[in-house]
Regions:
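Surface-exposed, charge/polar-rich loops and edge strands
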Residues: 2-185
């Protein structure tokens, strides 16, 4: 069994796109997933599955949500070891950063550093970013809401669909994935 992490984009914000976490756990169980746990109310789940294709799991979860809830929700699934790699590869690890203002944008495909080649980092200071394998790390010390750089990360510049999680959530999900892998042993 492989440990996976599912990240659902744009749910439970306001009154639209409501996906109760109990329902998410039930949908994942219905897809053959085991050891299903959710974190927060924002579409984060850790689970095991015998399959080896995270993209197929994401597609299956999207279909289940559409069928059962009538919602179109983009889902991103990563192997637990890949989420641990995201944490371990933190390009800002040597700095004290407010984890609530430090985001990881998880992409549907490979990150494209060339998509950012024309950006003048000084124009977005004090915000900073670094491009990973299938993610972009983003620091917004003055907050995310008014960050011009954060707005770019949700636009077409990325070339891929994405969903963001703050560092607190990323590290907690990585820890949950580690625990699940150890327990499933």
């Amino acid at each position: 069994m492989t440990t996976y992490v599912a990240l659902l984009r744009g749910i439970n914000v306001g009154t639209k796109q409501r996906v109760p976490m109990r329902t998410l756990r039930d949908l994942l169980s219905g897809l053959g997933c085991g050891s299903v746990r959710t974190h927060l109310n924002s579409g984060n789940a850790v689970f095991t599955h015998p399959g080896s294709d995270p993209d197929a799991l994401a597609a299956g979860l999207e279909e289940a949500i559409a069928r059962e809830l009538g919602l179109s929700v983009r889902c991103f699934v990563r192997e637990g070891v890949n989420l641990r790699r995201v944490v371990d590869a933190n390009p800002f690890a040597d700095r004290a950063i407010d984890p609530a203002r430090f985001l990881v944008v998880f992409l549907s495909g490979a990150a494209r550093p060339d998509a950012f080649a024309d950006l003048d980092p000084g124009a977005y200071a004090p915000d900073e970013f670094a491009v990973g394998e299938r993610e972009v790390y983003l620091i917004c010390p003055d907050g995310i809401r008014d960050s011009k750089l954060a707005k770019l990360m949700t636009g077409r510049r990325l070339g891929e669909d994405g969903t963001a999680r703050n560092w607190n959530t990323v590290t907690r999900l990585a820890a949950m994935a580690d625990e699940t892998t150890e327990a499933d042993g």
